[in-house]
From Swiss-Prot:
Regions crossing the membrane: none
Gene for this chain: pyrD
Keywords, alphabetical: Cell membrane, Flavoprotein, FMN, Membrane, Oxidoreductase, Pyrimidine biosynthesis
EC number: 1.3.5.2
Cofactor needs: FMN
Cofactor note: Binds 1 FMN per subunit.
Membrane topology: Peripheral membrane protein
Residues holding FMN: A61, G62, L63, D64, K65, T85, N139, N172, K217, T245, G268, G297, Y318, T319
CDD domains linked: DHOD_2_like
Subunit composition and interactions: Monomer.
Protein name: Dihydroorotate dehydrogenase (quinone)
Annotated substrate binding sites: K65, N110, R111, M112, G113, F114, N172, N177, N246, T247
Protein origin, superkingdom: Bacteria
Length: 351
């Protein structure tokens, strides 16, 4: 069905197409028509960060920034949903145009800039959602006019506001579209920031009587030495998990494309190799007690399998959905299932 809808959608401005897709999804969900338009996703129970997931394929942050489409998105078969990025105060984001579709490359360049209605609006939306289908992650960031020296205040405020409603919280330090944000990944800065957030997490756990996992979302553009340094900090601070990776400011395989010079983060198929290398390096430098989510460039089931082979416990997709539609979710689940079955069969044959 999506293959019929996509050509019409792609005649629209990219950001307008995004909005139309979400409105159409909501209409289909509330009318009861969504099951007729999507394929059933078979369960593949998975555990990570101490949470149970109906399957290991989730939606990455960015599609539903304000938590207004949670139930409809879960109905597409995702094992978990991550909403946001949300910030303490509402902000409009960067000037338009700020979202660019590269159809032949199955890629998108965005410089959205954390446009959102603010964490209080998100909390109200989450409180009104049913979300019984799987874990809900909430991705938090800082406002663009908050100096890095005060960034921990923004992250702590958001963490305190979403803690009671989230199944896990992601600390977004890696968007390339907020000036200076990625500097927070520098080793000593990262150590101080995560230390403060871990203290807040422990205080909130005592207050609410439950531990909500805290994940760190990393950039794909770090050098090997920077990745290793970040891994040391993440291990020392005993974070619950890591998401690898966000979008890239490099332009792999796109040098001749007319949109390659647009500022912003690149996602989609060209990011797959780069993000998977970062994922694999983090896996080799972090203990198995720290689960990883692999995201970046997943456009087919084989891509999801590659993330799992590189050490991911879970995967997320977003840009791939723009080009493949909701069927990508089930395709990824089945690819991971086949990989797990093959691995299990191999172990049995060697015993």
């Amino acid at each position: 069905m999506y293959s019929l809808f996509r050509p019409l959608l792609f005649t629209c401005d990219t950001e307008r197409a995004h909005d139309i897709s979400l409105r159409t999804l909501d209409i289909a969900y509330h009318s009861g028509a969504l099951p007729l338009l999507t394929r059933h996703t078979r369960p593949l129970p998975t555990t990570a960060f101490g949470l149970n997931f109906p399957n290991p394929v989730g939606l990455a942050a960015g599609l539903d920034k304000n938590g207004t489409h949670i139930d409809a998105l879960f109905a597409l078969g995702f094992g978990f949903i991550e909403i946001g990025t949300t910030t303490p105060r509402p902000q409009a984001g960067n000037p338009k145009p700020r979202l660019f579709r590269l159809t032949q490359q199955q890629a998108v360049i965005n410089r959205m800039g954390f446009n959102n209605l603010g964490v209080d609006a998100l909390v109200r939306n989450v409180a009104g959602a049913r979300r019984r289908n799987g874990p809900l992650g909430i991705n938090i960031g800082k406002n663009k006019d908050t100096p890095n020296e005060q960034a921990s205040n923004d992250y702590r405020y958001c963490l305190e506001r979403v803690y009671a409603l989230a199944d896990y919280v992601t600390i977004n330090l890696s968007s390339p579209n907020t000036a200076g944000l990625r500097a927070l990944q520098e080793e000593q800065t990262l150590r101080r920031l995560i230390g403060e957030l871990r203290e807040t997490q422990e205080t909130l756990a005592a207050k609410h009587g439950r531990h909500v996992p805290m994940l760190i979302k990393m950039a794909p553009d770090l050098s090997d030495s920077d990745i290793d340094a970040a891994a040391r900090v993440l291990n020392e601070m005993s974070v619950d998990g890591v998401i690898a990776t966000n979008t890239t400011v490099t332009r792999p395989l796109l040098r001749q494309h007319p949109l390659a010079s647009e500022a912003g983060g690149l996602s989609g198929a060209p990011l797959l190799g780069q993000s998977t290398l970062v994922l694999r390096r983090l896996r080799t430098h972090l203990p198995e007690t720290i689960d990883l989510i692999g995201v970046g460039g997943i456009c087919c089931g084989a891509d999801a399998g590659a993330k799992m082979a590189a050490g991911a416990s879970l995967v997320q997709c977003y840009t791939g959905l723009i080009f493949k539609g909701p069927q990508l979710v089930g395709e990824c689940v089945e690819a991971i299932r086949r990989r797990l079955e093959a691995s299990s069969s191999g172990r049995e044959n060697t015993q």
